[in-house]
């Protein structure tokens, strides 16, 4: 029985280490950290003396394009007090969404930053282990390595770990020795776990493995292509019928003396560069389609697409976006519950419910279409002039927008008075000119 238990523990430990390796690779590809190191083993050491390894980064662009929920942001309505506490939330949530798309599952700690003006901060954690009670999808505790100041050459201390549950925080060294144990009064685990999609048979959801796999293939193919181009340009010297050894120097400034009957030639591989390029395009387009994206290459050109054509082309991605809205609305509720509990422990009361409105990205409209759309919304009382001005200039507050509109109306009314006077003058001028002409005729 102990043998079975030990085997299960070893398997779980192995799976945890493999997951950490996958997360590290995902983060490296997104950040562009030594991406060449992942394909270096595919080539012999002598290749590195010929060309540098290709380090193309399509992962970051794909992940950023897939993350649309917080592209523009979200409007949260829970009172002025909550608005002040969450000044950083929209910016942090944009990054959290991207990292969730990349890693599959991340943990975000909700931090109460005290000071003259307290506020929430949100710190994502990528490498972590969770503990459960009865529900395998609801963690009750978490442990993770504490980030060290690795850029500080004077810091050589051991790695520290943090442990959190609903009652206490524990700091440990890498040997498991407790450094500090501090109780807290939150009454809740101060972490929110976000997943790129709904969980199936495990707490963790896999990340963007297909994207980094395609990225790896692209880097290998591009490196091979550059290596082939080098050999095609310079070729490989080949000599027959002469016993001169392999260390002969060749070049345009070198004369070789060959014995009678020997031959000297330069051969080059017959690889098709265009086929390699088409294969790279196929890989990129395939992974893009699998993630509801489409790729347009620079040489395709063509007319600038209209908003309607973009909507039709992007229909599948729009449906996927609507599915994600429901998921992230649930995560926003989870964040708010944790925020509310933490605020209560510091004597701050927040409303029971959070009003939330995700600001959806819009497709471009022509000027005429935009004018008609704005006029329709004003006539149907879907928006007022203040809200419309704030859409065009979101740096304005409602009070500033209201003052701007009142000032513009007053100025336009004055201009309209002068315009009416000018038009009246233009109407009377031809009549007066005709009378003057008749007088001149009578005098003659």
Map each language-model feature to its residues.
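Polar/charged side chains located within well-ordered beta-strands of beta-rich proteins
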Residues: 26, 42, 160, 169-171, ...
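Short, charge-rich amphipathic segments
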Residues: 2-41, 149-152, 204-225, 247-273, ...
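Generic structural signal for hydrophobic core residues of well-folded globular domains
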Residues: 30, 42, 46, 51, ...
